Every structure is written in structure tokens, then in C-alpha cells.
Amino acid sequence: QKGNAGELMYTNPNHPYAVTGLTPLAESPVKSHLDIVYTAAERPSIITHGIQKAVLTYNANHDRIRMQYSDNSRNLLTRYYLGDNYELDVDSTGVHERLYLGGGYYDASAVLMKKGDISSVYFIHRDYLGSVLQIADAQGNIVEENNFDAWGCRRNPSTLKAYTIGAAPKLLLGRGYTGHEHLEMFGVINMNARLYDPVLGRFLTPDPYVQMLDFTQAFNRYSYCMNSPLCYVDENGEF
């Protein structure tokens, strides 16, 4: 039994750590089905859920540089990534730019947001894992408040209950748990090298590295941070 997900099943003896099935709870926020295509470097390339589709593009170093999100062949969002501190979104409302100040996606304390000719600075309040808990405008007004369980599942800050599918408010920065990008339309978090399901508390693909040969948890290649999410952060999906 896993929190608000339901009962997990492990029925493949050749892959004892791989989840083969799930009996979800009545209000489980886990997505029922995702089709994912990977690159030769095992990075997620195409993610499909029903009529929703995201196409991810990488550079020669396997760093994500663009995401195109569409719905029934209708482009809804194109997002560009530059370095580790700049993002540009193009959608039906125009062009939105985000430049992180004093750091990158995972540790910056402020962000300069620009839409058209209007620029605004917002201050990012994080917890010790780097998760975005609050965002304040230049006048100190709280414009966003977030809460996450230990595994990164989004919760209502007032009730501490997990949001049901489609009920979570849009993230101002598109990022939340440990500073990573939430792909709310697919119910996963993009941790760069791999996709992570915060409801299951597991990665969707195995870790290509074993970091600690003398620690049993390191051999569960689907686990997140050796099953110690309050102690460690996986910044790139591999280490």
C-alpha cells in the first residue's frame, strides 16, 4: 500500500522492483496510462496521454532545450530552456520569459518574469530540499503557496490533502517539488534524465548507475533517493 496511490503489485520475478500493476484508491491522483518514447540516451522524447502529447528535444549533451505540448494536433505550449536559469514559454496569450536570479532552477531566491513589455521580480521561498513553497511579489504579497508530501505529491496547503486529478492550481513557475518541472497534464515530474511519479514515489525507468555498492537501497533502480526523500535530492534524475 502506498499512501494515496493504492496497492502496488510486483509480479515479474525477472524485474522484482518494477511495478506491474496498481489497484488505485477511489480518489487516487495517479494517471491511468502513459505512452512514452525514449531517445537513444534513454531520455523521455514523446509523452502521450489520450489526446495530450509532449515532444521533448535535447542538445548534444542530452540537456533538454525545448518542449512542445499539444492537444489533438493543436499546439498549446512551446517551452525553451537555456542553461540552468532561463525559460521562455510561447502560448496563446503571448511570450513569457523567466530569468532566475542569484542561482538556477533549484536554488535561486528570485526570478525576473517578463510578458510583453511588463517585467516583474518575484521572490521564491523554498524549503531545505529546494521545493517552492511560496512566491511573493515585490511588495511582499504572497501570490502562490504550495505544499508537497514527502514524495512530491502536491497537496492543498490549507487541508494537507492531496489534490485530485485536474484540481491542483497551475504553478506560476511550472516548478515545485525540489525545484523540478511538474508536467501536470501527465501527472509526472521531469527530473531531466528520467520522469518521476510523485504518487507512486518511483521513477518510471531504472537508474543506469548504482551509487553505493554497500547499501541495499541503491540496488532498487526505480526508487527515489534510495527511498529517503526527506534526506536527499535527485537534481538530474541519475545522482
What label would you give each PLM region?
Residues 7-12, 93, 117-192, 226, ...:
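A motif-centric feature for acidic-aromatic and gly/ser/thr-rich catalytic loops and repeats
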Residues 165-167, 212-221:
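A short, polar/charged loop-to-alpha-helix boundary motif
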Residues 40, 60, 128, 197-199:
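A cytosolic small-molecule/anion-sensing beta-strand core signal
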Residues 1-121, 142, 157-173:
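Acidic/glycine-rich beta-solenoid
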Residues 26, 40, 179-183, 195:
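Short, flexible loop/turn elements at secondary-structure junctions
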Residues 135, 153-158, 194-204, 208, ...:
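Short, low-complexity export/processing leader segments characterized by acidic and small residues
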